[in-house]
């Protein structure tokens, strides 16, 4: 495979899957713009990668898409080969426990922000015959219920529908769209969503026992697939949602 340099955007790149994806692209020499809310974690993501740049912005801010567009012009040569819509927010709680702020925050980050950012980047994506990768969730696949995390799951299920619909809409413009649906990945997201560390550790242990491969995933497990899907050899793949979950979603 010819190792040509690509221009890549990764949202939610300050930790977890986003950090692993950004580092994986940067390690192969791609120009990477890592987007996230907080400058410090973003700086840690790009440390040691001279072609990686950061943009600290809340992706739900109405001004965020145009801020990214400006960085594309200044840092990425005006083209986008790969856009990874990874930024996510989860708030655990059953229906009677969620307030409006928690509901709207999850929909804004997990569903609305990818729509508006992808829309803003259509021209640089088309110029590059680019790829959009939407990071969903294996928990949103199929017909399995997800009590306590239903709003997050509903938003991620909506993202999967966007993946399939955009593949049809944008294919004539030379843009591919693929979904990657991680299973239970050890990212610390549960603690950030309100779980205690003890509860989160117990959750990971229990889920690892349910996964056919016998363990929960690592961020690098997901990043490997995202990078491979951007390779020229994958150029005929579009509209699919790939579960990276150790087989959990088919149990």
UniProtKB/Swiss-Prot annotation:
GO biological process, one term: daunorubicin biosynthetic process
Protein function: Involved in the biosynthesis of aklavinone which is an important precursor common to the formation of the clinically significant anthracyclines such as carminomycin, daunorubicin (daunomycin), rhodomycin, aclacinomycin T (aklavin) and aclacinomycin A (aclarubicin). These compounds are aromatic polyketide antibiotics that exhibit high cytotoxicity and are widely applied in the chemotherapy of a variety of cancers. Catalyzes the NADPH-specific conversion of aklaviketone to yield aklavinone.
Enzyme class, spelled out: oxidoreductase
Active site: 152 (proton acceptor)
Gene inactivation effect: Cells lacking this gene accumulate maggiemycin.
Gene3D superfamilies documented for this protein: NAD(P)-binding Rossmann-like Domain
Annotated catalysed reactions: aklavinone + NADP(+) = aklaviketone + NADPH + 2 H(+)
Name the UniProt record assigns to this protein: Aklaviketone reductase DauE
Pathway where it operates: Antibiotic biosynthesis; daunorubicin biosynthesis; Antibiotic biosynthesis; carminomycin biosynthesis; Antibiotic biosynthesis; rhodomycin biosynthesis; Antibiotic biosynthesis; aclacinomycin biosynthesis
Keywords: Antibiotic biosynthesis, NADP, Oxidoreductase
Annotated coiled-coil segments of the chain: none
Single GO term (MF): oxidoreductase activity, acting on the CH-OH group of donors, NAD or NADP as acceptor
Positions contributing to NADP(+) binding: 58-59, 86, 152-156, 185
EC number(s) per entry: 1.1.1.362
Lineage: Bacteria, Bacillati, Actinomycetota, Actinomycetes, Kitasatosporales
């Amino acid at each position: 495979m010819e190792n040509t340099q690509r221009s890549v955007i990764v949202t939610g790149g300050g930790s977890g899957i986003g950090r692993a994806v950004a580092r994986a692209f940067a390690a192969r020499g791609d120009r990477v713009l890592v987007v996230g809310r907080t400058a410090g974690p973003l700086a840690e993501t790009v440390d040691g990668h001279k072609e990686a740049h950061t943009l600290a912005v809340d992706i739900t801010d109405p001004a965020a898409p145009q801020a990214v567009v400006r960085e594309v012009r200044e840092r990425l040569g005006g083209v986008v080969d790969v856009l990874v819509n990874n930024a996510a927010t989860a708030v655990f709680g059953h229906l009677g426990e969620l307030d409006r702020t928690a509901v709207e925050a999850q929909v804004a980050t997990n569903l609305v922000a990818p729509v508006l950012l992808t829309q803003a980047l259509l021209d640089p994506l088309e110029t590059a015959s680019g790829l959009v990768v939407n990071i969903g969730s294996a928990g949103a696949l199929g017909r399995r219920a997800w009590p306590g995390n239903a709003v997050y799951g509903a938003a991620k299920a909506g993202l999967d529908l966007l993946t399939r619909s955009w593949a049809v809409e944008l294919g004539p413009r030379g843009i591919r769209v693929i979904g990657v649906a991680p299973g239970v990945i050890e990212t610390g997201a549960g603690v950030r969503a309100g779980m205690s560390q003890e509860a989160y550790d117990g959750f990971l242990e229990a889920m690892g026992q349910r996964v056919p491969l016998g363990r929960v995933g690592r961020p690098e497990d997901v990043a490997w697939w995202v990078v491979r899907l951007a390779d020229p050899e994958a150029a005929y793949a579009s509209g699919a949602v790939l579960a990276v979950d150790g087989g959990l979603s088919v149990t």
